[in-house]
């Protein structure tokens, strides 16, 4: 929520340019925008740059699908989602917030509690973005989240509309139409 970051995000919003944030928790040796437990900095950013599409990504973002403590915020929490965290609350409150499921953090958040993951995908299918990331080594390991989504589609746990929104339509909806 640094004023310089807010200004940058507002400028991007004026040009209809979405911005992806790699969010982390406090600590040394990480990269991205630091945000304490509960995502208060992200919430202030969303409030102060309401015309900017903000795409959340990274461990500090996805760990907040359920309540998390500071030591686990920059990691990959496991186990059932017994209570919702800051992430679902923010998605419900701020229509300019989107969620990128690329990399292990998004995949982990959605698969740590399969029933909750499916419910999350259904509720927020209009603001979840499929992406890829360089953190997976080989081509077969690069996109486990695509196999996960395809499996949910094949089993009927998500419908074709949700699958299509997540895997492409949502992104096309937020990218600016540039005239060349």
Provide a role label for each language-model segment.
Residues 1-130:
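Catalytic pocket-lining loop regions of alpha/beta-barrel enzymes
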